[in-house]
């Protein structure tokens, strides 16, 4: 099995797009691996954006405090909560509420599968179609990292042109409908298009290559 960050480390990357940056811990890894690359991040949760800015993550990436979806404007964002101490792998998780499961989609089966995670609040956040993000117009994307908790189809629906210019795509998926209207892997692959082939299925995440880009 290909270790995803070792795979990324070996690539020549000029432009890296991270969709769903959370606290920016992966962002920091990407910057360490590729100090000269352009890193463009999207994170809609105001709580997470505050953590990123406090840690200075916005100093080494282009941070957009917005969600990516299939429309431009504003959108409802369901904010997760919970005691992350049992699962904490770093100080950021230990010191903050569990915001990792927040989504543009309403949680459904997620509430039964992960009972310790709640969704007590929601927020109206800015949203955009990736195809309409001005700073990425016409840009070749060497690697796109997507972690959006069940809202993958919304991201991809608004990114059809950008995906044609994207060489590698790494996205989370789930074959259970944990969020309302969540698509499974087969449905996501159909939406993304036949130009992407599966390089490695991690069972919850999948690495894809655009064979015509």
Residue ranges and their predicted role:
Residues 1-213:
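Phosphate/nucleotide-binding beta-alpha loop and adjacent structural elements of enzyme active sites
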């Amino acid at each position: 099995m290909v270790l995803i960050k070792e795979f990324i480390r070996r690539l020549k990357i000029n432009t890296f797009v991270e969709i769903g940056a959370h606290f920016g811990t992966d962002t920091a890894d990407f910057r360490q691996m590729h100090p000269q690359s352009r890193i463009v991040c999207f994170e809609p949760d105001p709580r997470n954006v505050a953590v990123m800015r406090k840690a200075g993550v916005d100093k080494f990436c282009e941070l957009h405090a917005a969600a990516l979806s299939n429309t431009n404007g504003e959108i409802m964002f369901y904010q997760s909560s919970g005691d992350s101490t049992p699962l904490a792998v770093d100080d950021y998780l230990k010191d903050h509420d569990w915001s990792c499961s927040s989504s543009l989609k309403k949680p459904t089966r997620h509430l039964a599968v992960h009972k310790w995670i709640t969704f007590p609040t929601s927020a109206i956040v800015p949203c955009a179609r990736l195809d309409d993000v001005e700073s990425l117009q016409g840009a070749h994307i060497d690697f796109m990292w997507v972690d959006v908790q069940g809202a993958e189809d919304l991201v991809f629906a608004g990114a059809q042109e950008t995906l044609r210019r994207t060489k590698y795509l790494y996205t989370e998926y789930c074959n259970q409908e944990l969020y309302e209207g969540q698509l499974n892997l087969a449905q996501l692959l159909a939406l993304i298009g036949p130009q992407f082939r599966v390089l490695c299925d991690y069972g919850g995440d999948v690495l894809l290559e655009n064979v015509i880009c």
